[in-house]
Regions:
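Long, highly hydrophobic alpha-helical transmembrane signal-anchor segments
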Residues: 25-55
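Alpha-helical membrane-inserting segments
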Residues: 50, 54, 116, 120, ...
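Functional transmembrane core segments of multi-pass inner-membrane proteins
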Residues: 39, 135-260, 300-309
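Interfacial loop-to-transmembrane junctions
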Residues: 230-231, 265-290
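Hydrophobic, aromatic-rich alpha-helical transmembrane segments
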Residues: 29-37, 103, 107, 127-130, ...
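Membrane-proximal soluble regions of multi-pass membrane proteins
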Residues: 53-105
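Transmembrane helix-loop junctions in multipass membrane proteins, especially transporters and channels
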Residues: 56-64, 122-126, 148, 173-177, ...
Length: 309
């Protein structure tokens, strides 16, 4: 009887302590220091997975099995040797088993992805938009590095990007208002926001891929050889689904400028000739990231200049 009374007496206290603990954990999680750190660390882990995608997708291998191993000796990498960035630094950039040098690409991709996820949190907050742009950034990392290494832009990554971008369009705001502008001129009432967002995504994909297809076809007819693969066209469909029409055009412009500058520098330094195949997808990916984080302020600044004139 005494034990039962003690149990009944302690039970409310247990609930109180549990409630206090839950509130405390929530406050710590919502603090301004833990969430950015969590976003960065999660980005590092995702970056480790992106390395697997970069290496295996072009070779048409599974990104799930087998476990990661040293490309030289084939020894499976232990979990404690697979900690993003940190393991590479501890091992001195070498395989623990055969001492073969491990490419700096691995920690670079992990660190880049971590920083991009951190930037998505700071710019978009703890929102669905932040998740959308984090996934978009991860896709761009895979496409950019793969094109730089292999000169290909895998269809599986591009089509996955199109599908994910269209899916997110139903849960996020319209990207640039192009669909709303069209609706105001054709309808007496604006369509629902998910419809506007979906139309914005489709317009971005059509304009992005269509513009690059016209450029590629024109180059082929003028020069008699391909100057741009269809991978770039499909990549811009994925980029356009996420960014919408206006920022997709800005991406093409930014990517073209980056590619032109790098190409001129390489030729002027006599390191490459005029027929050198530049990885245009790499520059498009870099341009898309620049537009993602700086495109809206740049567009607002440009529109303000036009308004002044």
């Amino acid at each position: 009887m005494l034990k039962l009374c003690q149990t009944r007496f302690l039970l409310p206290n247990c609930f109180t302590l549990t409630a206090v603990g839950v509130v405390g954990v929530r406050r710590v999680w919502q603090s301004q220091s833990v969430i950015p750190l969590g976003a960065f660390l999660f980005g590092l882990v995702v970056g480790s997975f992106l390395n697997v995608c970069i290496l295996r997708i072009p070779a048409d291998k599974s990104i799930v099995l087998p476990a990661s191993s040293c490309p030289k000796c084939g020894k499976a990498i232990a979990p404690y040797d697979n900690i993003p960035v940190l393991s590479w630094m501890i091992l001195g950039g070498k395989c623990r088993n055969c001492k073969t040098k491990i490419s700096i690409m691995y920690p670079s991709v992990e660190l880049l992805t971590g920083l991009l996820f951190l930037a998505c949190y700071f710019v978009f907050g703890l929102t669905v938009d932040a998740l959308k742009w984090a996934i978009f950034s991860a896709l761009l990392v895979v496409l950019t590095i793969t094109d730089l290494r292999e000169r290909i832009l895998p269809d599986s990554v591009n089509f996955f990007g199109v599908g994910v971008g269209l899916l997110f369009s139903f849960f996020t705001k319209p990207t640039d208002g192009t669909a709303l502008w069209i609706a105001n001129r054709w309808f007496d009432f604006p369509p629902p926001q998910p419809v506007l967002s979906f139309v914005d995504a489709v317009l971005g994909a059509l304009v992005g891929s269509g513009l690059l297809w016209v450029v590629a076809e024109g180059y082929f007819r003028l020069r008699g050889r391909e100057g741009m693969g269809l991978g770039d066209v499909k990549m811009m469909a994925a980029v356009g689904v996420f960014l919408g029409l206006k920022r997709t055009l800005m991406t093409v412009l930014a990517g073209s400028l980056l590619g032109s500058v790098i190409g001129i520098v390489l030729i002027s330094l006599s390191k490459k000739d005029r027929n050198y195949e530049l990885p245009f997808g790499t520059f498009l990916g870099a341009g898309a990231l620049l537009v993602l984080f700086f495109g809206t302020p740049a567009l607002q600044w440009y529109q303000s200049l036009l308004a002044v004139k």
